[in-house]
Regions:
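Gly/Ser/Thr/Pro-rich low-complexity, intrinsically disordered segments
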Residues: 27-389
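A detector of low-complexity, intrinsically disordered, Ser/Thr/Gly/Pro/Ala-rich segments
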Residues: 1, 5, 23, 27-28, ...
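Bacterial N-terminal signal peptides that target proteins for export
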Residues: 2-17
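Bacterial N-terminal signal peptides
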Residues: 15-25
Length: 389
């Protein structure tokens, strides 16, 4: 039987609030939150560290990695398609199969063009489905054993033509004239492209098919070939879009032809059920990273980190002189080290910085209200296993 969750606002401790300022001095905690916000299990804690002198307001969720009652899930801006929404609305729209949401933070940086607004900059895996390809920045994922990982991830997605030659492809993104991009229904009702050649693909006999997963080779049959863009999308089809400049350098296919789509990444994320991009890395092997001067400005920040025992979701309020001025990257990295993180990475910050826990947004967004984000990382209590009858 599940225990009721009770979150306790912990007394601020030097070990939790010690962060390097530009002179790398320790924060001195002069105030701490005292409001009860819910209930706790021993494996889950939420705290708000407040320092009135700097000032700083830092929101932290800590979860025990050894506890097997939780997992992570990512969200999409529009629930099932790319887009933008505030974190609290993304949590509400999370599929029931993810489990009961306990905490969430905003996720990756994102595409801002109108047609593909909310497309994550780097890799996202949602319930095992790959939403976007990695772009080489720092990304986070969990392996099947519940072990967190962080490194730069690279795409080797490609289409393999009938003659055996291969062409690199993007996924659910802006297609330039010299590019090839694969689209799934995550993009929306159509590809939203202009010009080029587009192949509507359906499942070939005995081939794995949708939802699209990393580490597969899909054999697809061309259902239709179109000499214009904006091809329709459905849950059982994909569209391969070829830009007009590239079209003259790749084979022209007719309906009934087959091709292959390889969804490889480096490192291999085929076993990951959840992944989200961001960056840069903040802490590696227990040591804070170093950055050039332009990253030494204080802003609201969102980060995640872990050690062998605990996983942390962290948000630092900023741009509010009476509440919290924010942190530089060195200050944030030092704070995460003081928490005990051996690995940690940055996520989108600024006005996007949001931490939701136990039913409500706990931080003070810098723009006075939540700003829409492309995705979020959500901590959920697993759904109980169905009992046998």
């Amino acid at each position: 039987m599940n225990m009721k969750l009770r979150a306790e606002v912990l007394r601020s401790r030097v070990g939790w609030v010690c962060a390097a300022l530009l002179a790398f001095t320790c924060l001195r905690t002069t105030a701490s939150s005292t409001n009860e916000v819910g209930k706790q299990d021993r494996w889950f804690y939420y705290t708000n560290d407040v320092n009135d002198e700097v000032p700083l307001s830092i929101h932290v969720v800590r979860v025990e990695l050894s506890h097997h009652d939780f997992e992570f899930c990512t969200s999409l801006g529009k629930g099932t398609t790319l887009g933008m929404a505030v974190v609290s609305d993304q949590v509400k729209a999370l599929p029931a199969e993810c489990g009961q949401p306990l905490a969430a933070i905003n996720g990756d940086f994102y595409e801002k063009s109108e047609k593909y607004l909310g497309r994550p900059r780097d890799v996202e895996i949602h319930l095992g489905e790959v939403i976007s390809t990695p772009a080489g920045h720092t990304s986070f994922w969990m392996d099947p054993d519940g072990v967190p990982h962080m490194t730069n991830v690279y795409s080797r997605f490609r289409v393999i033509w009938p003659d055996g030659k291969a062409t690199p492809i993007g996924l659910n993104q802006q297609r330039e004239d010299d590019m090839a991009v694969l689209y799934t229904a995550v993009t929306g009702s159509s590809t939203r492209t202009a010009g080029g050649t587009e192949y509507i693909l359906e499942q070939s006999t005995n081939s794995p098919w949708l939802p699209l997963k990393i580490g597969q080779v899909y054999t697809a049959k061309v259902r239709d070939a179109r000499a214009s863009g904006d091809a329709p999308l459905s849950r059982d089809t994909m569209v391969l879009s070829i830009g007009p400049v590239l079209a003259g350098r790749v084979p022209a296919l007719r309906p009934g032809a087959t091709l292959q789509v390889a969804t490889e990444t480096v490192p291999d994320l085929s076993a990951a059920r959840v992944a989200i991009g961001g960056g840069p890395a903040l802490v590696q092997d227990g040591k804070p990273m170093q950055w050039p001067g332009f990253l030494h400005m204080r802003h609201p920040r969102t980060a995640l980190g872990w050690n062998k025992d605990y996983f942390y979701m962290v948000e630092v309020d900023g741009r509010q002189s009476n509440l919290s001025v924010g942190m530089t990257f060195p200050e944030l990295a030092a704070y995460l080290v003081k928490l005990g993180c051996t690995q940690a990475m940055n996520l989108d910050g600024g006005g996007s910085a949001t931490l939701w826990a136990l039913g409500a947004v706990r931080n003070s967004p810098s723009e006075g209200e939540e700003r829409p984000s492309a995705n979020a990382l959500v901590l959920v209590r697993k759904k109980p296993a169905a009992s046998a009858h």
